[in-house]
Amino acid sequence: MEKFQGYLEFDGARQQSFLYPLFFREYIYVLAYDHGLNRLNRNRSIFLENADYDKKYSSLIVKRLILRMYEQNRLIIPTKDLNKNLGHTNLFYYQMISVLFAVIVEIPFSLRLGSSVEGKKLKKSSNLQSIHSIFPFLEDKFSHFNYVLDVLIPYPIHLEILVQTLRYRVKDASSLHFFRFCLYEYCNWKNFDSKKKSILNPRFLLFLYNSHVCEYESIFLFLRKRSSHLRSTSYEVFFERILFYGKIQHFLKVFINNFPSILGLFKDPFLHYVRYHGKCILATKDTPLLMNKWKYYFVNLWQCYFFVWFKSQRVNINQLSKDNLKFLGYLSSLRLNPLVDRSQMLENSFLIDNVRIKLDSKIPIYSIIGSLAKNKFCNVLGHPISKATWTDSSDSDILNRFVRICRNISHYYSGSSKKKNLYRIKYILRLCCVKTLARKHKSTVRAFLKRLGSGLLEEFLTGEDQVLSLIFPRSDYASKRLYRVRVWYLDILYLNDLVNHE
């Protein structure tokens, strides 16, 4: 590892000029497969931990791959050999290269990040990594906004777009040519065998997607910091990406000399941008006309600069007071709570009507039921059915599975403003569990519950149910408060599986 660190300690002017030779070093493959990059990237992606890649690794295969890379013609898959062992062998080599490329290309970014935070006392909070941490921010900010632009980020349809995007950040021409060569060769094989699943390393694919999105955000966020409203005029000159960083450094000079008739910008502090799960939202207090201009800007940004056919239907304008916003598995909208205050001055009394605006987050019950039906927990109408494929397991295993699913759902949707839909989902899972156990023992549901008692269903009580029941006393008013309590957890790092149904 010390040899690896010494090889990578280069100055800023040449920090991206020595990536290609790393493909021919055996110790890099060892580091890539035994997760030796912990010091460079402490927050290692979970996609690197793939058991299939580790099982196929050997030093002999690495040596053969390095010899083949010295002669790139041996890595080309001839058309007549696509269905033979040679094609499968080369495809496995591309799999190894994808693992290595994801690690090597991240090296300059990791070193740059480490040098930027070195000597700075930064407080790290793992709570900010939670998905639920964004909802308190939305509750505080979105209550003052009128419209939200919901954008589905498109994927590039041509491989050269990915290569060109990476070219602005990796200056090593040899690495880029080698990356282009391997990517095209892999796609040739993929087109031939369309039934074969992708064997490219998930971390490599994630890096390509993040590079693609980062390029888009580098332009959009640059405009966001200095603007809010874009006039409906041409701004194609701004898409000269090679001179982009020079324009950032000389922003005032550029806009005074070249852009007064091309791009009009106005300051607006009430503009928030959030990206999540392949989508992004833009919230603002703009009028419908200005929101349509933002929509026009997004469409032209993707079509003119990224050469991606971007339909206007991918950008939805939602009015928070009327429309529901689908966000991380929740349906969010603004709710008006009327409040009446009584004020008395001397002998006269006054009634003052106030309206409190609050962001309301609800559970998309129809989407969740559709996901449960897809996984055979209920039918499309939401009626529970037995899980036939689980009847071969033990009773404790079946019960633990249902309890774990129920608690995960309750944990994720604990921030819902109304718990009625959450209770319905719990009911479906409880009855599905009972029907599965009754089917296993060849009994009816009523007879099975009568034999075991109600203690079976107590296992489905979640941790928050038990804690909140201790906080609030047992009364009708307390039960209503418990029904409205919203809990955001700071340990949820992944979307619930049922959220990904759509």
Swiss-Prot record:
Keywords: Chloroplast, mRNA processing, Plastid, RNA-binding, tRNA processing. It is found in: Plastid, Chloroplast. GO terms for cellular component: chloroplast. Pfam families: Intron_maturas2, MatK_N. It comes from the Eukaryota. One of its GO terms (biological process) is RNA splicing. InterPro entries: Domain_X, Maturase_MatK, Maturase_MatK_N. GO terms for molecular function: RNA binding. Belongs to the intron maturase 2 family. MatK subfamily. Usually encoded in the trnK tRNA gene intron. Probably assists in splicing its own and other chloroplast group II introns. This is Maturase K. It comes from Stanleya pinnata (Prince's plume). The lineage of its organism: Eukaryota, Viridiplantae, Streptophyta, Embryophyta, Tracheophyta.
